[in-house]
Amino acid sequence: MRGTVLCAALATLVACQRVDNTPPASQSPAGTDTGMKVAAPATPPPPTLPSPPTATKVAVVEGFLTPESVKYDTAQDVYFVSNVNGGPLTKDNNGFISRVRPDGAIENLKFVEGAHNGVTLNAPKGLALRGDTLWVADIDVVRAFDAKTGAPRDSVSLASLGAVFLNDIAVAPTGALYITDTGIRFDDVGNVLHPGPDRIFRIGPDRQVTVAVRGDTLGRPNGITLDSVGKRFIIVQFGGRSILAWKPGEKAPSVIAKGPGGFDGVEIAGTRLLVSSWADSTVSSYETGQEVKVITGVPSPADIGYDAKRKRVLVPIFTGSRIEIWQLP
């Protein structure tokens, strides 16, 4: 305020000095007004910054049953979609994984199907790929399938460590798997309970299972992804509002950004850090530490995927039995 008043005063002073250079009244021609007033120049309005470009919806693929996660396989140029097909903690062996082509055509709705061909799959959620192996988080077990044939390859139970709600998986360069345990259950009427604890498990290349990190700072951890540039993992809170960074060996993660909360999926898309939120039905970028909405109007956006070849965000609509494909600008 003081700066504005000072500028106005200086402008008026300059204007008055210009007026004082006019001839005195006695020398002025008759009828000439020598009391001319000069207004201070108006302060120009601040420039209007353009809104950040948003993504464009290019396809909607329907026909799924509670889709939770989408993962892009660069080697096969195909999308995998996990289908819970029921309660997220129900061991009913009716979960399945779909194969979808980038044009939106469902190549095989039940590429991997519980209770078929020797497969056990209850409520599949987060997906991860390493080579031609597709890893799947399934309540308290992590399962592996051949990404080309769908045949079962491996199964690692975390039940003995008290796993409650295995949610998402990320693969380290060493081949170790890091799996979030959101630590939630549901009562008979569907209310969310949080018996905890909040943890991230590690499955080593030797299949040895350990607790990599635990604690309330994880905030019901949901999505996890590897930041290969920062040599760290990015973790998002479902029960809080924080986006976290963590390196193996650290006792606790650090907060790198905050947003609306209710976070589910996280992907690094080029230079963008993309996070989906149930709280406001969006996918936003946080690479600067500030929220920038990229996709809006997506209810229950679960564990998003990213098609790096086409620069597309793959959004599973958990309660809508569909996935939406969005083109980044």
Segments from the language model and where they lie:
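A short helix->beta-strand "capping" segment at the edge of beta-propeller domains
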Residues: T43-P67
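Short loop/turn segments that connect beta-strands within beta-propeller blades
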Residues: V100-A105, D146-A151, I203-Q208, K247-K251, ...
